[in-house]
Amino acid sequence: QWFGKDGQLLIIHNDSIVYDQWTEPFYPRKNATIFSVSKSLTGLLCGIAVDEGYIKSVDDPVTDYIPELAKYNATFKKLRIVHLLNMQAGFDFYEDYELTLKGLFKIFKITQLQYGHDFTRLFRHIKFKNQPGEKYEYNSLTTALLSWIIERATSKTYADYMSEKVWKPLGMERDAWVTIDSRKHHHTQGFGGIATNVYDLAKIGRLYLNGGTWNGKQIVSKEWIDKSLEKTTENKGYHYCWYHQYRDNDADNSSFYAFGVGHQFIYINQKKNVIIARIGNNYNWMGWEMSFFDSLCDKLF
């Protein structure tokens, strides 16, 4: 059980399942919250919204879609959708899950984001510590804003749009669940609130390996996939809601992955045609380095 307690691990090579193992309380097709892996699904949904013209360009300022943001802080006029995709918003927003006395006040905002009845209220008082596009800094508020923009641009709920454009076309094994801030406001937590199973998670990986096609149908444009998987070592490897890593400065020998607390992940190795997906409950451990799976693929495939 090298994949840890309380979880399920799936390895797919050349479209065939070569490893599928779980421990209780998990079982095949059980849905579990995938936490920040949700961000990569939100990035996918953004690409579809761009393809369909709901979002004209990732270079559009966020105020084109949520004009009221400009009233809260003029810097929002400089913030573009691409900055959200790359975690370069510049928000003064603390995100650290280590509970210390010093960090209790700072962690209050992330608690508001995850458990507040209207997370959009956070944007009324948010400050910027960097100019948009200036610096990478991971925080979930950026993807919260991105999911809000998708809903505003499409005039559809996140769940309905995801179901129509991704879940149904890919023939997912089970319905996914999404968390909203409240029934009254109904803003979707696209930054960490999706629950799905390991097989459907792997299908997302296959969609990216297939250049955005599924059974001959283009789900998201190849242009978006290519841009998402663009080989860059800048921005700490985070690009269009995916992490990228390279070995020995060899851009052709690359892998990319989505990762969430508790060790939820999708790992994709293009060169080896391998997808590894995991869901689990390891909340006290952030997990292996993804380079472990690079080495694993080298040895097994």
Regions found by a protein language model. Name each.
Residues T142-I149, G190-T213, Q264-G280:
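Active-site-proximal alpha-helical segments within enzyme catalytic domains
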Residues D15, T33-V58, L84, L146-I150, ...:
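Active-site SXXK
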Residues R29, E98, F105-R183, Q189:
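Catalytic-site signature segments of enzymes, centered on catalytic residues
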Residues A258-F301:
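Structured C-terminal helix/loop/strand segments within mature extracytoplasmic catalytic/sensor domains
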Residues G47, T63, V82-L85, T120, ...:
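Non-transmembrane alpha-helical segments in soluble domains
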Residues E173-R174, T179, D226-I275:
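Active-site Gly/Thr loop motif
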Residues Q1-F26, G171, I266, N273-A277:
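A short, well-structured edge-of-sheet supersecondary motif
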Residues E52-Y94, H125-K127, A153-F191, T196:
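Active-site helix/loop module of the DD-peptidase/beta-lactamase fold
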